[in-house]
Regions:
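Bacterial N-terminal signal peptides
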Residues: 2-12
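Sec/Tat signal peptide C-region and signal peptidase I cleavage site
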Residues: 13-19
Length: 575
């Protein structure tokens, strides 16, 4: 069911998949470049994610074993897909208002369950799964055609998009797009390496919900590799009940002996869990850290007066959850970003949840509204650091969110809030939340007006609010022209601006390697190469700036080119 697969941060369907313009030569000219139709898609207003219960040590009292008819597991994501379609202004086929009830259709003749027929996905079908169809992304299903799988995986693994908002949006589109494997006609195996790489990259970004949705679309039990990833991500999401029930019915699918023992205990099968632990300990099949944590987890009588265990040398999702279950939680700040997801539930306190939310928001893995909800979750209990940021944002949000905002109060609270979000490197999250409401302030000549204009320029759709704004300085004139994709119409006010403008010039040539990828029709690999070039530019390699922007335009990604160019100029104070 698609509604269960979509993560709350997933972009809403655009009103239409708009073409991004046409030009005689896709690599030349300052006008809009031809497009595959890919837009920088808008994020839907998300609902709160499910707050799962913590893992606890097993209750030794006799309990009835839950079968498949037991308590239903809540969906992985709380978003209602049909509501999302309605909010996006898209009607379901045949939906023309409320239809009268028609009881003339098929009527059941028996209370027996109907026969259910299943169809196993082929390896190529499993590798092509995605959450965004071609009609939404504008990318063809042949996105990866012709490329070497190993080369694509290397590019995806080494691509860093932390604090590169335009690249984050594009990368999520690539990772979630429905597209055939690079060699769908070749020998097939139960695992598609590119699919596994996509899942791993989503987890690396902290986007656990879409990663799990991809696994479910491909089939959680299709292969040991997919099940192992499903098990690990379920642990970090607090949704391990489903994989543990699978392990209870099919022990051989367990990714490890430790996982099987944990799931037996999680399913209240104490005797089996204890027997497995004793046997594994005698045979030496468990890592020392696994054996220590499982022993403490299963033997509640050891808790009182027990010496705290040393932290595991190599933390895994299972060891992380076991540590939390015995009352010795591990901090997530030094762990991979996926572990921060677990802190969103507030089990480690509001401060830890705020820090986790900011960490995930920097990679676009957390919806802006969820971030705002956590910022608004209480009153700061101290001053300094993140508490000053919370106080500043709360004051501004209260001012601009009033039924009749006091414009003087909004102008007073905006600069501190903006500075606070700059400190957190979350300017684009702030822009996504408030740009629309700040549009009427952008024409004012004070500090708040300048911040409001910058917020509009960093918003997902800057041109929606710029028509009524007159530039006050040469810099503002250039930025406004750049947002419209016409930087050649005004004089660049600085050397950096001139470099950016060259990305929209007919004279800018692409690097030979990138031009060859485009000429050979290797669309997906060419996009990844352009993204890597842009990341080098943001790291300080000025010579890569214009070619990177020109590459996006040559690939038809005009919206991405404009957003990337604006972010180079507006976020370059990050260092």
């Amino acid at each position: 069911v698609l509604a269960l697969c979509l993560a709350p941060w997933l972009v809403a369907l655009p009103d239409a998949v708009a073409a991004q313009g046409t030009a005689a030569d896709p690599r030349l000219g300052s006008g809009p470049a031809p497009a595959f139709g890919l837009e920088q898609m808008r994020r839907a207003d998300p609902l709160d994610m499910r707050q799962s219960l913590p893992v606890t040590q097993p209750d030794r009292r006799p309990q009835a074993v839950r079968g498949t008819g037991g308590e239903a597991t809540a969906p992985m994501s709380a978003i209602d897909w049909l509501d999302a379609l309605t909010q996006a202004g898209i009607a379901r086929p045949g939906a023309g208002g409320a239809a009268p009830f028609d009881d003339s259709g098929d009527i059941a003749e028996s209370a027996l369950a109907p026969e259910v027929r299943t169809l196993t996905l082929s390896a190529s079908d499993a590798g092509a799964v995605g959450l965004l169809p071609a009609s939404v992304t504008g990318l063809p299903t042949s996105l990866w055609e012709g490329a070497e799988t190993a080369a694509l995986i290397r590019r995806i693994e080494r691509l860093e998009v932390d604090r590169l908002p335009a690249m984050q949006s594009l990368l999520y589109t690539l990772l979630l797009a429905e597209a055939d494997p690079p060699d769908a006609s070749g020998p097939q195996t139960e695992d598609d390496p590119l699919l596994l790489a996509r899942i791993d990259k989503l987890a690396d970004l902290g986007a656990l919900d879409p990663a799990m949705a991809l696994i479910e679309r491909a089939g959680q039990t299709r292969s040991p590799a997919l099940f192992a990833r499903w098990f690990d991500l379920s642990l970090l999401s607090g949704l391990e009940s489903q994989p543990c029930r699978r392990i209870a019915t099919d022990p051989d699918i367990a990714p490890s002996q430790a996982a099987r023992i944990f799931c037996m205990a999680r399913n209240s099968d104490w005797d089996t869990a204890a027997l497995l632990l004793e046997t594994a300990g005698a045979l030496g099949t468990l890592e020392p850290s696994e054996e220590r944590l499982l022993t403490r987890f299963l033997h509640v009588d050891l808790d009182d007066g027990a010496v705290p265990l040393p932290p595991p040398t190599e933390v895994t999702p299972l060891l992380f959850r076991l540590s939390e279950a015995i009352g010795e939680p591990l901090p997530t700040s030094d762990l991979p970003r996926a572990y921060a997801y677990y802190d969103l539930r507030g089990r480690a306190g509001w401060k830890a949840a705020l820090e986790a939310a900011e960490r995930l928001a920097r990679t676009g893995a957390l919806p802006e509204n969820r971030l705002l909800g956590l910022y608004s979750g209480g009153r700061p209990s101290a001053s300094g650091g993140i508490w000053d940021r919370v106080a500043a944002l709360q004051a501004f949000d209260a001012a601009i969110g009033a039924p009749r905002p006091d414009r003087a109060l909004v102008r007073e609270t905006l600069p501190p809030a903006w500075e606070a979000m700059q400190d957190a490197r979350l300017e684009t999250s702030f822009a996504a939340l408030y740009a629309g409401r700040l549009a009427t302030y952008a024409a004012e000549g004070d500090a708040a007006g300048r911040i409001a204009l910058r917020t509009l320029l960093l918003a997902p759709d800057p041109t929606d609010h710029l028509d009524a704004i007159s530039p006050r300085t040469p810099t503002e004139a250039f930025l406004l022209a750049l947002a419209r994709g016409r930087p050649d119409q005004v004089e660049a006010p600085s050397e950096r601006a001139r470099i950016v403008a060259r990305g929209f010039s007919a004279e800018t040539e692409l690097p030979p390697r990138l031009a060859r990828l485009i000429d050979d029709g290797l669309l997906g690999e060419a996009i990844l190469e352009a993204m890597q070039l842009y990341s080098f530019a943001m790291e300080g390699n000025v010579g890569d700036t214009a070619p990177a922007i020109a590459a996006f335009r040559a690939l038809g990604l005009e919206e991405t080119a404009r957003a990337a160019a604006l972010q180079i100029l507006l976020l370059d104070d990050r260092g």
